[in-house]
Amino acid sequence: MKRITLIYAWLFCLALSVAAQEKVVKLKIVQTSDVHGNYYPYNFITRQEWKGSLARIYSFIEKERREYKDNLILLDNGDILQGQPTAYYYNYIDTVSPHLCAEMMNYMKYDAGNMGNHDVETGRAVFDRWIGTCDFPVLGANIIDTSTGKPHLPPYKMLERDGVKIVVLGMITPAIPAWLSENLWRGLRFDDMEETARKWMKIIRAKENPDVVIGLFHAGQDAFKMSGKYNENASLNVAKNIPGFDVVLMGHDHARECKKVMNVAGDSVLVIDPASNGVVLSNVDITLKLKDGKVLSKDIQGVLTETKEYGVSEDFMKRFAPQYEAVRKFVSKKIGTFTEDISTHPSFFGPSAFIDLIHTLQLDIT
């Protein structure tokens, strides 16, 4: 009887030892993309309340951080500097104050950002100033400084949470030259996404030995060539053709998507896209089981979360109330008077007073 008792005691201790060596880590990855200046829950163009915005997103973040704490990773996928007067005002009017977008993202504690084509469109003076104000890295593995041949921005960010190593690799659609004048991005070039991903995946594996790899790509999933030269939307191609990614966060095409695809190595990859204007979030849960620092299993699930289901953060609005008022005054400023009604509708079919007005102003200014 004594011997049996000792055996049971030994087995119990062994079980405790095994359990002590194993642990479960839960991560929450939240992605915003194509926010397009929708920082406040108010559309300064239509002068109506807006169902999206960083103010609503922050309510969601506050709630989730209470559960996940530092295991929540917040990422932005570009096209955040253009689209609303809020962005325009701090891009070109008030260039002395810290950029509002950077201040808000710092307040929300973003872990990394990514460049989008509309961020590039603001011009180097604007986006370099914004990047310089951000407390987090803005990534761009395929944005190359032509004078050095090296990335103009950090290619990736390595994060460690609860013993888990997570790498975020950032890339932008390479079709910038097809849309934007070179004076906006002079000194830079934009390399193919698949070639860049293949190169950096080798480096990341060798140097960082990550447990989780996330692609943060400002590009959609419907790949096609522009002018026979640029693969504008290569996110899905990268997910399928470059083994190593666990999650590919997409953007640029303003199309909601959440699905899993199989890569060439036979591994499942979650691809997810929250569309635009801060209306939807990419909400990804990653559960890892580890033993002695090695990953035994990995479960990845994603959903698209509507931000309208969350209220506006009062703390956020209070913190950025002065900037809101500055933008409101700017867009409310009287700049002239029409002697008769004017409509944009005729411009779709022929000559119009509206287009004449724009052309006259352009000629006067230039």
What feature does the model see in each segment?
Residues 1-23:
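Bacterial Sec-dependent N-terminal signal peptides
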Residues 5, 32, 366:
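Ser/Thr-centric signal marking residues that sit
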Residues 13, 69, 320-321:
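Short, flexible coil/linker elements and helix-boundary hinge sites characteristic
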Residues 21-307, 349, 354-355, 359-361:
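Acidic, metal/ion-coordinating pockets
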Residues 295-296, 300-366:
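Hard-cation-handling environments
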